[in-house]
Amino acid sequence: MNNEQSLSHTKWECKYHLTWIPKYRKKELYGDLRRYLGEVLRELARRRECEILEGHLMADHAHMLISIPPKYAVSQVVGFIKGKSAIHIAREYFGRKKNFTGQHFWARGYHVSTVGRDEEAVRKYIKEQEREDRRIDQLSLFR
């Protein structure tokens, strides 16, 4: 299966599994905010010519399988997406109308791993992560 994309002089296929958390790992990504944030993240990715191939927002972290053109560093794209999405959240959910500075929605940092032949396994992991977390939580009730 050939999923290569192209720029003017480059053929590429660069996929990454990204994970990051809200500040203090607060469980805030649910309900309306979760739905809204999904749309915002996809739009922000498009602005950097990226495509979110798979994504899932858990209550306390975000998972994303994303295709990023080689002209952008992964850190640039993640910084852009986290920074701009925090501004969107501040304006839409916390009523901030002016410049949003001094407060943070996301924690610093993120986890990234490259995706190659294991793409289907990564997609499955992202899709089933919430169900697995619930199963583990249920098991911990009986300890």
What spans do the regions from the language model cover?
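Basic nucleic-acid-binding interfaces
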Residues: 1-143
